Amino acid sequence: MTEKLYDKDSHLKEFTGAVLSCEKTGENYTVTLDRTAFFPEGGGQQSDRGYIGEAYISDVQIKNGEILHFADKPLSVGQAYDCKLDFDFRFRNMQNHSGEHIISGIVHRLYGFNNVGFHLGAEMTMDFDGELTRRQLDEIEDLANKAVYENLPVKAYYPTDEELKSLDYRSKLDLKENVRIVEIKGVDVCACCAPHVKSTGEIGIIKILDFEKYKGGVRLLVKCGTDALRDYREKYKSVLEISNLLSAKQPEVSLSVVKLNEQLSAEKAAAAALKKRLIAEKAAGFAPQTDKTAVFEDGLDIKELQLLADALCVKAGGIRGAFSGAGGAFSFAICGEETALEDFFAKFKAAFNTRGGGRNGIRQGTVCADCAEIERLFTE
């Protein structure tokens, strides 16, 4: 049985461990040690990573009670190696996981909701079996950070059977023996196998970034500690860039973006109105000499092409196509009586590299061809 050093000291960065076994598994080697500080994936948290000697450990799993280290190099059985954790990675995981305990404890105490899902990978999410509002989440976030400011001790221990009976603790599983408890006094008591910070002050900050309804409850996206700092830094850079672009004070950036969006919407509406006038004028002056016509106009989207083709068809009948694009690539809409249009569009697709379709007297899509080639087909 491997001695679990991470159970005794969550801040242990280096240790010496003897190799009990080393077996090749695919491209890696599966290694067991007599003692390890590497935490295996579990409880929603990803495993530690680091080095055993010169071998890089990319993953750690526990199977049938055995802790398996996945190494990129073989190691000698019976030899003791200096081992080193990627402690920045471990500490980041501990900050987030301990932050999750604080939030879960507060949610349970205030609203009676249970944490029914937890994942800590590149992002951290937690699921609760009841819905929470933005205002409630703000209150939870304030209380969570208050617990951080108080720098409360985080205690991990194995209670006796008698002690366990008297404990009111959170647990997703019905555990009977070897229950490891992580306690943050006055905030949370929870069964957990993972390493945690020694005191809440090490977490630094807890930030609830987003939430969504999920399976009758709510899913939270949360960042703690270093992750929260990096997130703030990146968002601050974005706010600063937007502030400079809009010549707006940082607290007024949101209002400035709203005003800019309103201006853009007004300009889009004005442009759409002008295009509708263009379409109407184009149709009013349309006097074709043949029963098929291709018209080319710059800057029209597919809906505007549909309007133009339909207006031309209403004015003069026959089959009328509207095209917009450049460099031999066009969006198009073609209107006409369905039976005649179906026959013509079959020839159109056979002649050109065309993507599109439709029904009820209209076909639309994209085509790669020269203007002259398209016009030639419409005059045949």
Language-model-derived ranges and their functions:
Residues M1-E380:
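A glycine- and charged-residue-rich anion-binding loop/surface
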